[in-house]
Design a protein with these regions (language model features):
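Extended recognition patches within non-cytosolic domains
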Residues: 1-4, 95-97, 111-118, 149-214
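Extracellular glycan-recognition modules
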Residues: 3-60, 94-97, 161-164
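Short tryptophan-centered beta-strand motifs in secreted/extracellular beta-sheet-rich domains
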Residues: 23, 81-92, 103
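Short hydrophobic/aromatic patches on beta-strands that form ligand-binding or substrate-lining surfaces
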Residues: 21-29, 86-88, 137, 150-154, ...
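Beta-strand-rich, repetitive solenoid scaffolds
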Residues: 7-9, 38-40, 48-52, 58-62, ...
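Extracellular glycan-interaction patches encoded by glycine-rich segments
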Residues: 125-150
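Short surface loop/edge beta-strand patches of beta-sandwich-type extracellular domains
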Residues: 1-18, 68-78, 140-142, 178-186
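Acidic glycine-/aspartate-rich tracts in secreted/extracellular proteins
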Residues: 26-32, 42-43, 63-65, 91-95, ...
Length: 214
């Protein structure tokens, strides 16, 4: 997807406190800053997930040019031959700060962070809002493009889901494998979507018709 980005402008506003993002990716290049996705109003108001130049990842939210959420992993992600399933499950209404954002890599929750700034309770993140906000998949709004492949990119817009909604452990090999049928605990939500189900289709498979464009 180098130098390619997918775009969607939400037409509805759903919960900005509860949502889940899941995607499968294979890195085509390491040791470079690459944004996997961002939701962006402007440079000072956005939410994004990216790989850093040292191959850690960062999930962050900027509000009014200030960091409202920053989680940067200690773990390094340098495997360019295998697939990673990343699940980011958010519920800022939780009383315990570490329960407000949970990040899973291949079904295992990441708990070791070099930087860990959790959102304040009940914070509304910069996501899931109609108007001028835009989803970008594969870039940070026309910069820091992701180099690699993606598949089964899903957004559940109103609930914090478990990673088992999107994948399962193979009973023989112990490997985390994709679930080709995704059923959220409640529903995808009005702004929810599932694209790249076949690795290339931008047509939403969730029945919401939230189709992306190049």
């Amino acid at each position: 997807m180098a130098n390619t980005q997918l775009q969607l402008s939400p037409t509805n506003t759903n919960s900005r406190q509860k949502f889940t993002v899941s995607f499968w990716l294979k890195r085509g290049k390491i040791n470079s800053e690459q944004c996997v996705w961002t939701t962006r109003l402007d440079s000072g108001n956005n939410t994004l997930f990216k790989f850093n130049a040292n191959d850690t990842f960062t999930f962050k939210c900027n509000k009014s040019n200030a960091d409202a959420l920053v989680l940067t992993s200690n773990a390094l992600f340098r495997d360019a031959s295998g697939w990673y399933n990343v699940v980011i499950a958010v519920d800022t209404t939780q009383s315990t700060d570490t329960n407000r954002v949970k990040i899973y890599i291949n079904g295992v929750q990441e708990t070791s962070f070099g930087t860990a700034t959790y959102p304040s309770q009940n914070l509304s993140l910069e996501i899931n809002e109609s108007g001028n906000q835009v989803w970008y998949i594969g870039s940070e709004s026309s910069q820091n493009y992701f180099d690699g492949s993606m598949s089964y990119f899903a957004f559940v817009s109103e609930t914090q889901e478990a990673p088992t909604v999107f994948g399962s452990t193979d009973s023989t090999t112990g490997e985390w494998q994709i679930k080709t049928s995704i059923t959220p605990s409640v529903a995808f939500g009005t702004n929810g979507f599932l694209i790249l189900k076949d690795g290339s289709s931008l047509t939403d498979q969730s029945s919401n018709s939230n189709n992306f464009s190049l």
